[in-house]
From Swiss-Prot:
UniProtKB keywords: Cytoplasm, GTP-binding, Initiation factor, Nucleotide-binding, Protein biosynthesis
Residue ranges with Basic residues bias: 278-287
Binding of GTP, residues: 396-403, 442-446, 496-499
Name of the protein described by the UniProt record: Translation initiation factor IF-2
Provenance organism: Chlamydia felis (strain Fe/C-56)
């Protein structure tokens, strides 16, 4: 065995020696050893030869004027190329191999990429590698141009010493072009610490650079990729700058890597960007407040109206504390509710030990007149006052002849054109009589126009109480007396219809005395006059009495003062817009003057009298129809003249701003109606004038019932428009039109949306119609009326019909298709319909008492012998309000 092993090893050694000799490795080893010895000699004798050669090479590239031999030019100007296929890694760069090892092109093309730029074997022209580092100023260096001497091939000396490891090997490829990194001995050197130069200014000229030793420059500052290959350690990468690379283009390395944040999660941060410029967000910290006792005020001043929230803020309390205290006292409010009662606000303040005063400064600013018309006249200089015509209001019960009596005085025929022969609007007229001018107010007598009568009593100076001699004092007559007494106005009684045969003045005197109006004929102070509107009897005496009362009252006014008065009626005209009938109480109203009402303003454009004649001025106690208003004022609103329209607009704007502050407060639902499950009739009212709306709405709201109630969604003046119809369709409401019509283009919409619209000219007809609609909402009351009863004697089973009951009629009549109750031991087991009734196999409509019959119940099969079948019918009765 040992012999065989020795023989095998000997054969391997001989074979390896033959291979080495064939490849020429022994000669290469000798050349390498000889080259190493020559390098050491050259370096010791001329250490700066390589540096000079590098400078000369650089000069030859930059300065073409330098003369050189063709050999030197070819060797210096053309850059040296690294060819892995014809150089051995064991040979130094300065030596040239005479016989390069041939390598196939396939092997070179499949070589992996390296960090150095390696030219392909097919390149024919040399490549010039530009130096990207800032050039060194040549002026500061004194370099002698030495012509390069051609390198002589040293003699090959074979040494037996083993080859030393080469430190400066640039290429990592062997003679076959494959990696030999694992065969090379790796030696590491600590990098030298060098002071980094300061960044240079970017300019076109090269900056001066301090001179360095040739050794330092050759070791640390390589000027070309070829010259620094042997000086750099093999473990360092090529640090030569590529074109376009500069320290400004390089991203700074973050020593403290940034933590992953939410912005990274959503891709908002770019990892390559430097985010150090971002300002760090300051973390919010809880503020610690010093706890101290809140000193609540003991005396405050608040305006009215005010919300619960604002009142609590003024009192330094929580709104919940106020609401809790008010709930204890039986008042339910929420935080946004408005308090407009002075007593309620002051009571809340006393509960918390705070005195509350009402601040009226804002209201005083918006209030133009600080006193009433009567107070203003009393404060005026008597020399400026003149006697004005009396304002007389005719009041009384409906159909007692008020309007007819006025027609007789004015020689007019107003009553003939009134719908239903009753007055439903308030009229103002100027009447010239033998005793002087009189302003007459005609008020409605129907119970629905109570507000109109109240306004008439407040405006007028004398009330003429018209009483029909054949009917006597009625309900509205008593109401008119109450209004007159409340306004402290003189009453003159006109006993009308004295031409009728059943006229009895003594009965009227007795009724007047019962209400503390003792007539003069009975020794009292109440003036009474017997009149007849048809014959004109007693009219002169009535006028004389009115003139006498006006003289006693000493009615005066100041015509030079600014005009003040009251709105009698207002309406919406198609061509003129908002118009109003006003009555001047003091001063004189001229065309073009600006007026301020409660919630609107205007500039008088036109004025007309009751005969539609133009007027330029309106003196005291004179009514007029004016136009040019911003909106429609309410009946009974006072007005006053201001300097110009701008002031009037500003005043109304301030008033409306205060009203709109609380306009958005929602109406609280009627919890009583919700608990009682009351039904609601929703209405939309349209009328010709503001007074008619007021009268109709008040009459409807007076309809009181525990089962149903009326709710007015909207009320306005004018014709029924498309917006009203759409509102009614959306809210399922009924539109009530009073003395008005429907717009032409809105009639088709009524049919398409199916809205119910009812038009009326007489107010009590409208009120009666509303009552009927409210009654129709109520479910009718069902009443069960017994018709007869029968006892079950036998039961029969049928596969087709079910159970058939043989019965004997004990009471009344059993009728087919009527309701039936099955009663057992006085307990009702079932209610249903009697579907079939037979008498001796014949269908009959009814079976009377004492007869037998067969009965089939619809949907019930569980009746037994002895049960009672009671036949009854259901009668529905409408409910009453």
């Amino acid at each position: 065995m040992e012999k065989a092993k020795l023989t095998k090893n000997l054969k391997l050694k001989i074979k390896n020696a033959q291979l080495t000799k064939a490849a020429g490795l022994d000669k290469l080893k000798q050349k390498l050893a000889q080259a190493g010895s020559s390098d050491t000699k050259n370096s010791s004798e001329k250490p700066s030869a390589k540096v000079a050669e590098k400078v000369v090479k650089k000069k030859s590239v930059v300065d073409p004027s330098v003369s050189a031999t063709p050999e030197s030019v070819s060797s210096e100007t053309s850059p040296r190329r690294i060819r892995a296929k014809n150089r051995s890694s064991f040979v130094s760069e300065d030596l040239e191999v005479s016989s390069p090892v041939p390598v196939d092109s396939d092997t070179t093309s499949s070589m992996p990429p390296v960090e150095e730029e390696i030219a392909s074997s097919t390149d024919s022209e040399p490549e010039v590698i530009e130096v990207t580092q800032p050039p060194i100023e040549e002026k500061s260096e004194v370099v002698t141009k030495v012509p390069p001497t051609p390198l002589k091939e040293p003699e090959v000396v074979v040494k037996k010493d083993p080859p030393k490891s080469v430190v400066g090997i640039k290429s990592n490829f062997g003679p076959t072009g494959k990696h030999i990194n694992h065969l090379l001995a790796k030696t590491f050197k600590a990098p030298k610490k060098e002071d980094k130069p300061a960044p240079k200014e970017r300019s076109g000229q090269a900056q001066a650079k301090p001179q360095q030793s040739s050794e330092a420059s050759s070791e640390n500052k390589p000027h070309s990729p070829n010259n620094n290959r042997s000086s750099q350690p093999f473990y360092r990468r090529d640090t030569s700058k590529k074109p376009g690379s500069d320290f400004r283009d390089r991203a700074k390395k973050d020593d403290n890597p940034k933590a992953f944040t939410g912005r990274d999660r959503y891709g908002l941060n770019d990892g390559s960007d430097d985010d150090k410029w971002r300002k760090k967000r300051v973390q919010k910290t809880k503020k610690h407040y010093d706890e101290h006792t809140i000193q609540r005020p003991t005396h405050i001043k608040v305006p009215l109206p005010i919300t619960i929230k604002d009142l609590a803020a003024e009192m330094k309390l929580k709104a919940s504390e106020l609401i809790q205290k008010m709930f204890i006292h039986g008042m339910t409010y929420v935080v946004n509710d408005v308090l407009d009662n002075e007593t309620t606000v002051q009571f809340i303040g006393l509960e918390f030990g705070c005195t509350i005063d009402i601040d009226s400064s804002e209201q005083d600013k918006l209030c133009i007149e600080s006193n009433t018309v009567k107070e203003e006249i009393q404060e005026t200089d008597p020399s400026k006052l003149i006697i004005r015509p009396p304002i007389v209001a005719f009041m009384g019960h409906v159909d007692h002849g008020k309007t007819t009596l006025i027609d007789s005085l004015r020689k007019s025929n107003i009553a003939a054109v009134e719908a239903g022969a009753i007055t439903q609007h308030m009229g103002a007229f100027c009447c010239s009589t033998p005793v002087g001018n009189i302003t007459i107010l005609d008020t409605p007598g129907h119970e629905a126009f109570s507000a109109m009568r109240a306004r008439g009593a407040e405006v007028c100076d004398i009330v003429v109480l018209v009483v029909a001699g054949d009917e006597g004092i009625k309900e509205q007559t008593l109401e008119a007396v109450k209004h007159a007494r409340a306004a402290n106005i003189t009453i003159v009684v006109a006993i009308n219809k004295c031409d009728k045969p059943n006229f009895n003045a003594e009965t009227i005197y007795r009724q007047l005395s019962e209400i503390n109006l003792l007539p003069e004929a009975w020794g009292g102070t109440t003036v009474t006059v017997n009149t007849s509107a048809k014959t004109g009897e007693g009219l002169p005496e009535l006028l004389e009495m009115l003139a006498l009362q006006a003289e006693v009252l000493e009615l005066k006014a100041n015509p030079s003062a600014r005009a003040r008065g009251i709105v009698i009626e207002s309406e919406l005209h198609k061509g003129l817009g908002a118009v109003a009938t006003i009555l001047v109480q003091n001063g004189t109203l001229h065309l073009g003057e600006a007026l301020v009402f409660n919630d609107c303003y205007g500039k008088v454009k036109t004025m007309h009298d009751e005969h539609n004649r133009l007027m330029k001025v309106a003196s005291p106690s004179v009514p007029a129809l004016i136009t040019g208003l911003s909106s429609m004022p309410k009946a009974g609103d006072p007005f006053v003249v201001v300097k110009n329209e701008k002031i009037a607009k500003d005043i109304i704007g301030a008033r409306l701003a205060g009203q709109q502050k609380f306009a958005l407060q929602k109406k609280r639902p009627n919890f009583d109606a919700m608990l009682q499950n009351k039904k609601i009739l929703k209405l939309i009212i349209k009328a010709d004038v503001q007074g008619s709306i007021e009268a109709l709405a008040s009459s409807i709201l007076k309809i009181v019932s525990d089962k149903v109630s009326a709710e007015i969604l909207s009320n306005s003046v004018g014709e029924i428009s498309e917006s009203d119809i759409r509102l009614a369709a959306a809210s399922k409401a009924v539109i009530i039109g009073f003395h008005t019509g429907i717009e032409s283009h809105a009639e088709s919409l009524i049919k398409s949306l199916g809205v119910k619209v009812q038009l009326f000219n007489i107010i009590y007809h409208a009120v009666d119609a509303v009552k009927e609609m409210m009654t129709a909402l109520l479910d009718p009351i069902a009443e069960e009326k017994n018709l007869g009863s029968a006892e079950i004697k036998e039961t029969f089973k049928s596969s087709q019909l079910g159970t058939i009951y043989g019965c004997l009629v004990s009471e009344g009549v059993m009728t087919r298709n009527q309701k039936v109750r099955v009663v057992r031991n006085n307990d009702v087991l079932w209610k249903g319909t009697l579907s079939s009734l037979k008498r001796i196999k014949e269908d009959v409509k009814e079976v009377k008492k004492g007869l037998e019959c067969g009965i089939l119940l619809e949907g019930y099969q569980n009746a037994q012998v002895g049960d009672i079948l009671q036949c009854y019918e259901v009668i529905y009765h409408p409910q009453k309000l």
